[in-house]
From Swiss-Prot:
It comes from Shewanella sp. (strain ANA-3). It is an enzyme of class 2 (transferase). PANTHER family: BIFUNCTIONAL PROTEIN GLMU, NUCLEOTIDYL TRANSFERASE. Gene3D superfamilies: Hexapeptide repeat proteins (2.160.10.10), Spore Coat Polysaccharide Biosynthesis Protein SpsA, Chain A (3.90.550.10). CDD domains: GT2_GlmU_N_bac (cd02540), LbH_GlmU_C (cd03353). Residues 227-247 are annotated as: Linker. Residues 1-226 are annotated as: Pyrophosphorylase. One of its GO terms (molecular function) is UDP-N-acetylglucosamine diphosphorylase activity. Keywords: Acyltransferase, Cell shape, Cell wall biogenesis/degradation, Cytoplasm, Magnesium, Metal-binding, Multifunctional enzyme, Nucleotidyltransferase, Peptidoglycan synthesis, Repeat, Transferase. In the N-terminal section; belongs to the N-acetylglucosamine-1-phosphate uridyltransferase family. It is found in: Cytoplasm. This is Bifunctional protein GlmU. Binds 1 Mg(2+) ion per subunit. Homotrimer.
């Protein structure tokens, strides 16, 4: 049977107090509904039906050109009515998995367990036991078998005492789902078409109903307001931090780290507090990352060090390279083995060769820098002429004095020395010494101006 996923994402989310549709509010810089979509893809979904309503334009803009079937729910008449909008894209032989766009922490392993629990031609529902089940639909059993789900507002005193609750997530055979949805009624306390009513129909039809449970109740928590959104964010971060520690990272304080993408770590990685990871970050063995650093879409090789408050974006650090504190590597920057940049050095589309150093206060853009090069404080590669970018090439073992400007395009030959305060506008040959600053003058008897008293 093909797996067909229906994601309900039509709600406005009034309690969010926002113009943004509820499901677009982010967890770890990714919308809640995108988390759900990604999880659906990860379990091998053949098709995803996204049932939408409020904020259609914003939803379509945010989710882009993904492989989704957009199914409009013009009126919000209940969960059963929402799922019914997807019927045109459901085949009789499909296994239909129903998910929710505001339940972002559901794990692939939980959904796989749910699908495995579904009997042939039967139903599987995801349930959880809560000490305080108030507000949730209760799982009604007779002699241990599920016979129905009753919503909070429709439950009697005996049913309200039940601790096993419905998460709303279920796996249903396509043909039966179509039949049951067609038989739904809105004759209930809320005047809605409850999806949960199909469970009683399944029981009445003699269909076997199994249950599965998540590893943690937080997986099935939704977010209806910003407080709950923040709680889900913290839960997500705790889960991701745990993965890093299991993989070999030592987190100084696991509660003070933000992971907003896919992070891969080697062994004995040290991560100080308030570090942010975004996008795809790959970190080797024995890497040290200082407090307040931000790593975005970057690769860090073994034994490298990122000192506090440095920003590494779209860049690479080679073996035993170091950056910071307060350094910035922008897209296309690369530090080769044993290379170092210090505080307030910025690089973009530039390579700093093996063992080369730029200790402080420099801008290196559109530059190819060889091995064993020293970049003095205040050095700037003047790479932009107002219209186009140009390349600076600094070959091996060059010494660049402090406060030097290199006006690109320009090449500095091997072993050359550039005197402090020079402005280099022409190529420099190998082993040459170049000084372009004006001759120093000594004016004796000169008096400094004084303020005129008024």
């Amino acid at each position: 049977m093909a797996l067909n996923v229906v994601i309900l994402a039509a709600g406005k989310g009034t309690r969010m107090r926002s113009d943004l549709p509820k499901v677009l509010h982010p967890i770890a810089h990714k919308s809640m509904v995108q988390h759900v979509i990604d999880t659906a893809h990860s379990i091998g979904s053949n098709a995803i039906q996204l049932v939408y309503g409020y904020g259609a334009d914003k939803l379509k803009s945010a989710l882009g050109e993904q492989q989704l079937n957009w199914m409009l729910q013009a009126e919000q008449l209940g969960t059963g009515h929402a799922v019914a909008q997807a019927i045109p894209n459901i085949d009789d032989n499909d296994t239909v998995l129903i998910l929710y766009g505001d339940v972002p922490l559901i794990q692939a392993s939980t959904l796989e367990a749910l699908l495995a629990a579904r009997p042939d031609n039967g139903v599987a529902i995801l349930t959880v036991n809560l000490s305080n089940p108030t507000g949730y639909g209760r799982i009604v059993r007779e002699q241990g078998k599920v016979v129905g789900i009753v919503e909070q507002k429709d439950a009697n005193a005996e049913q309200l005492a039940i601790n096993e609750i419905n998460t709303g997530i279920m796996a249903v055979p396509g043909k039966a789902l179509k039949t049951w949805l067609g038989r739904l009624s809105n004759n209930n306390a809320q005047g809605e078409y409850y999806l949960t009513d199909i469970i009683a129909m399944a029981h009445a039809d003699g269909v076997e109903i199994n249950t599965a449970q998540p590893q943690s109740a937080i997986e099935v928590e939704g977010a209806n307001n910003r407080v709950q959104l923040a709680q889900l964010e913290r839960a997500y971060q705790a889960r991701e931090a745990e993965k890093l520690m299991i993989a070999g990272a030592n987190l100084r304080d696991p509660s003070r780290i933000d992971i907003r993408g896919e992070v891969t770590v080697g062994m004995d990685v040290m991560v100080d507090v308030n570090v942010i990871f975004e996008g795809k970050v790959v970190i080797g063995n024995n890497v040290s990352i200082g407090a307040g650093a931000i790593l975005i879409d970057c690769e860090i090789a073994d034994n490298a060090e990122i000192k506090p408050y440095s920003i590494i974006e779209g860049a690479k650090l080679g073996v035993a390279a170091s950056a910071g504190p307060f350094a910035r590597l922008r897209p296309g920057a690369e530090l080769m083995q044993d290379a170092h940049i210090g505080n307030f050095v910025e690089m973009k589309k530039a390579v700093l060769g093996v063992g080369s150093k730029a200790g402080h206060l420099a801008y290196l853009g559109d530059a190819q820098i060889g091995a064993g090069v020293n970049i003095g404080a205040g050095t700037i590669t003047c790479n932009y002429d107002g219209a186009n970018k140009h390349l600076t090439v600094i070959e091996d073992n060059v010494f660049v004095g402090s406060d030097t400007q290199l006006v690109a395009p320009v090449t500095i030959g091997k072993g050359a020395t550039l005197g402090a305060g020079s402005t280099i506008t022409r190529d420099v040959g190998e082993d040459e010494l170049v000084i372009t600053r004006v001759k120093q003058k000594h004016l004796t008897g000169w008096q400094r101006p004084v303020k005129i008293k008024k």
